[in-house]
Design a protein with these regions (language model features):
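Extracellular/periplasmic carbohydrate-active domains that bind, remodel
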Residues: 1-104
Length: 104
């Protein structure tokens, strides 16, 4: 059923090899193991109301998002949560490399 959580997936959402402008509205990604969202070779996208939540047990080392080789990405109203059971502090929310013109 769409919308039901699938625990222990390494990545919750992948967008790759897209140059055509696109939009995402009000997406919530929660409780994945490695990365909530992964963007690779993406350009000209706008993302509105993106929410991330990391669970204590499933994702103590999980990153909210990773972007590589992306350009012209705009993110508006991004929320990053960790549940109270996530006892480890988090230094990095988004890992970004080889990208241009990424705005939050």
């Amino acid at each position: 059923m769409f919308g039901q959580p699938v625990r222990m997936l390494p990545v919750g959402f992948i967008l790759a090899k897209r140059k055509t402008p696109g939009r995402i509205y009000a997406m919530s990604l929660e409780h994945h193991v490695r990365t909530e969202a992964r963007f690779h070779n993406v350009a000209n996208w706008k993302i509105y109301a993106f929410q991330f939540e990391e669970e204590g047990r499933e994702g103590p080392d999980c990153y909210m998002a990773e972007m590589s080789n992306c350009q012209n990405i705009e993110m508006v109203n991004v929320w990053m949560y960790r549940v109270i059971r996530a006892f480890m502090p988090k230094r990095i929310g988004f890992r970004i490399w080889d990208c241009k013109n990424i705005t939050f």
